[in-house]
Amino acid sequence: MIEDISKKIAWLKKNPKMLKGIFRGIERETLRIQKNGHFSKTIHPYLIGSSLTHKWITTDFSENLLEFITPTSDNIDYLLSFLTDLHSFTASKIKNERMWPFSIPYCFNDQTNIQIAQYGKSNIGKMKTTYRIGLKNRYGDLINTISGIHYNFSLPLFFWTNWENNQNKKNNTDLISSGYLNLIRNYYRFGWIVPYLFGSSPAISSFFLKDTKKKYKFKKNKEDIFYLPWSTSLRLSDIGYSNTNILDLNIMFNDFNEYIESFQNALKTPSKKFINIGLKDEHGNFKQLNTNILQIENELYTQIRPKRKTKDGESLLEALKNRGIEYVEIRSLDVNPFSPIGINKNQILLLDLFLIWCALIDSPKIDKTDFLLTTKNWERIIYEGRKPNQKIYINNNNETKTLIEIGQIIFKDLNEIALILDSNSNNLLYQKACKETQLFLKNPELTYSAQCLNFLMTTGIKKTGLYLANKYHEKFINKNYFNLNQSVLEQEVIRSHQKKIEIEREDILSFEEYIRNK
């Protein structure tokens, strides 16, 4: 079922420095709201900077959907304090608005007048907006206001080049890409534990449901909020932020070149469904960038993605093709409403341990049968993860074990890895986080989803959301900066606006020509 990795852990205990230098990055999305909880109708504030060119603060789908982006760092405290500084600066510029603390928005009706994010009159700016118009026409606008946390993670080069299993690989690029694909396949197999532990969207507005309430036995509270008693992360369900079945695209993460080829095919292959939408409206305005299965790489919504930093003018696929996988992006984290910045240190420590474990254990190639079973496991945890004696498939013979049984096996290894990481930093942080989180297995009421549901049922989503939003706002505007200061942040605002103007001046091609050349 799960490989015994005691020998691998013993090797790491002898070579603990192999795990020194883990780099991370965090992206946090949050909706700007009015004081009454309704969506903000204002454009992205000029005083925060240009959403096109600001290094750390931008927008996602809509004008009111903020996205905070930290630089990469091997220091967790630096990352969290940097993210806090970005929130504090933003709060100081939107004094009459608040930042919504949940992944799922509060919707008082289905006509929320969502303004798609605008990035100016440059070709790249128009392209970003047109892509979002395409998302609206393909999947709807409300669904795209669901927010999350993206956690970027990379293991040290020293680990990949010295780990005993990698000694015979031909070159560093191949072995690193192969290693990350192994990690990704195992994340699909066992990553359901992340929404079990940290899922924070057990309830959803009725406007998101459409016909799905017929399929699942949802209950409803007084606010017209639908919930399932054992659910963990409806954001990750087919109700929420999921648009493409990677099985249909034949993207299996088994081989690097096959992954690139399958991804490219999805970007080039027309979709009958999207052809029916049309490329332009009657006035000649674009309704989407193209009618292919994916408009651009970002449209592939998966639980985890291989990534590489891009150079100017380079696409993600080109970067991957040219230089291999550099890190993985974890996309299955809900916003943690119990943290002002949407994520806490314990979550990061636990994710580190789990992702290292995914890199260590044996990772057989996945076929379609395997993938269907892993998908069923994710679905079970998403909809009924806290159900007593919940079962998980462990092989393609339909054999099952309880979530607790599998979870205990995983945590046994995580505790061993925690010892190694703590030995590098001379503290007990990883062990403490591991032991505290392990309690969630036998005590599902400790999970974030259970705590969220309790608040939503007793206090309501609007009242709870506004209470937390106001509490965090006061905390942000009264907090001193940690790593950044007011001057640095104000200078970045000025620089971002100047850079946006430069980009607009440098455009030569018409937008049509620009799109054709992409």
Curated annotation (Swiss-Prot):
Q: What start and end residues bound the annotated signal peptide?
A: none
Q: What are the GO BP annotations of this UniProt entry?
A: glutathione biosynthetic process
Q: Which GO terms describe its molecular function?
A: ATP binding; glutamate-cysteine ligase activity; metal ion binding
Q: SUPFAM superfamilies this protein is in?
A: Glutamine synthetase/guanido kinase
The record's EC number reads 6.3.2.2
- Name the Gene3D superfamilies for this protein: 3.30.590.20
- Record has Iron as a keyword: no
Cross-referenced InterPro entries: Gln_synth/guanido_kin_cat_dom, Glu_cys_ligase, Glut_cys_ligase
- Which keywords accompany this UniProt record? ATP-binding, Glutathione biosynthesis, Ligase, Nucleotide-binding
Q: Which family does it belong to?
A: Belongs to the glutamate--cysteine ligase type 1 family. Type 1 subfamily.
* Xref: PANTHER family: GLUTAMATE--CYSTEINE LIGASE
Q: What is this protein called?
A: Glutamate--cysteine ligase
Q: What organism does the UniProt record list as the source?
A: Buchnera aphidicola subsp. Acyrthosiphon pisum (strain Tuc7)
Gene label: gshA
